[in-house]
Structure formats: C-alpha cells, structure tokens
C-alpha cells in the first residue's frame, strides 16, 4: 500500500540539494509535490523532470523571507491540490561571517531565511491542514556544535529545533505532528571528490548523502509513525557522538 499517493507535500528550498532529493522521493511515492524555491530556473527544471512521468508536481517561486510570498505559496498549493498534508521546511542559507564583522543586516538575512520562514510557513499551512497532517523542519547539528563565525547560522538552527517542540504542543489539538531533522555533513556536490579521511571521521564510515535525509522525511511523514512528535532526529553518521582528543 502506498500511503503517500495523492497526498500533497510542500518542500521549501526544493529545487536543489537536500530539498530536491526530498521532492523526488515523495514524487516517486506518487504524492503531489509543490517545489517552493527562489531559484526559478532550477525549480522549473525539476518540475518538468518530475512531470515527465506523472502530472503531480508544481513549482511556485517563493522567497521565504517574504511573508506575502509565503501566504501565496500556501494558497496556490491548496488551490492546486485541494489539501496540504505534509510541509517540509527545508529552505535555508549558510552564510558565515567573522563575529566582529557580523552586521544586523547579515544576521537578519540568515534568521529570516532559516528560522522565521519556518514559523510563517507552518502558521499558514496549519490553518488548512487536517488531522493526521505533519510538519518536518530541517535544523542542523550546528545547533549543538560550532566553528568560528557561525553565530547567525547556529542561532537559526537552534531556534528551529526549539520551535519544533513548541509547535508540536500548539498544534497537537489539531492532530498535526511536528518533528525536526538535524543533518550532519550531507554532501550535495561532488561526492567522489571526498577524501578517505572525510568518510572515516564518521562512525558510519561515510559522509552523508541527500537521500539519507529524504528517507528520514519519508519515515517521519508516514502515518504509521503517528506516535512521534516534538522530536529532533540527528542524522549525521554518528559524527556528533564521536569523542575527539588532540594527538
């Protein structure tokens, strides 16, 4: 039985990288897939590719920093497919700056793209969602570990993890589950160019791939897993559990 056939899934930042893999995975399950992205060229290309096999995908150009465009995204998605069953808040940017050079404008660009968009997309989608729907947010292991110059990014991802359990509480009465995924190193570029040392620093002995996150989304969105809500699942090949000492 295909539990996703005919379900409507919105994937923000769905035109490339992890988001593209998520969109493709749900399309293979015969879901109605809405690709929301600021990149019109890549978005339309993916829409065309997915619709070569079945007419169930729709690209909607969306700047997730813009509240009006988010409202239009949700409205158009509902008008096109008559329901919103799954929302995957994947859109995000990872711009790192020196702590002392980080301006308010730089800070707000990252926070508004990564964190505020999760709130706005979820608020608007939840208004139209029915019992049994779900929201999946993409955080990061950088919410709990850091490098220099990642203040805005880490704050945004930490906020996503926190707002996940807050929304899980607020939306429980509507029967909407809310969960979070924290990816580690997910290579969206040239996987073959990675070094052995890159793979060996993971317990899994390999760097992650976009499909690892897509499969986690399928798991969390599956109706049989309706006892899971308010959770943040780390998918990082065990990297954040590895104890490291200087040698």
Which residues make up each language-model segment?
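Canonical Rossmann dinucleotide-binding motif of NAD(H)/NADP(H)-dependent dehydrogenases/reductases
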Residues: 3-33
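Substrate-binding pocket helix/loop in short-chain dehydrogenase/reductase
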Residues: 98-99, 106-111, 198
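Active-site helix of classical SDR
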Residues: 122, 156, 164
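Alpha-helical segment proximal to the catalytic Tyr-Lys
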Residues: 127, 169-173, 226
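C-terminal helical subdomain
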Residues: 180, 196-228, 235-237
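Short C-terminal tail/terminal secondary-structure segment
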Residues: 145, 229-247
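Residue(s) in the substrate-gating loop at a strand-loop-helix junction
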Residues: 140
């Amino acid at each position: 039985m295909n539990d996703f056939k005919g379900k409507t899934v919105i994937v923000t930042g769905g035109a490339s990288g992890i988001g593209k893999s998520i969109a493709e995975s749900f399309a293979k399950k015969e879901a109605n897939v809405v690709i929301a992205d600021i990149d019109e060229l890549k978005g339309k290309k993916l829409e065309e590719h997915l619709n070569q096999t079945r007419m169930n995908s729709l690209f909607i150009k969306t700047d997730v920093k813009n509240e009006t465009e988010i409202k239009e995204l949700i409205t158009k998605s509902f008008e096109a497919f008559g329901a919103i069953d799954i929302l995957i808040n994947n859109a995000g940017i990872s711009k790192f700056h020196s702590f002392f050079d980080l301006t308010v404008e730089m800070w707000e660009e990252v926070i508004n793209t990564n964190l505020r968009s999760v709130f706005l997309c979820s608020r608007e989608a939840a208004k139209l969602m029915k019992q049994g729907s779900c929201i999946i947010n993409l955080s990061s292991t950088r919410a709990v570990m850091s490098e220099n110059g990642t203040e805005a990014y880490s704050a945004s991802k930490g906020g996503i993890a926190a707002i996940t359990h807050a929304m899980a509480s607020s939306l429980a009465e509507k029967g909407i589950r809310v969960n979070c995924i924290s990816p580690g190193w997910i290579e969206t570029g040239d996987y073959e160019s990675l070094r052995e040392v890159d793979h060996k620093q993971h317990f899994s002995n390999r760097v992650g791939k976009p499909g690892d996150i897509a499969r986690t989304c399928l798991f969390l969105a599956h109706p049989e897993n309706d006892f899971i809500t308010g959770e943040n699942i780390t998918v990082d090949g065990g990297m954040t559990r590895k104890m490291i000492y200087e040698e």
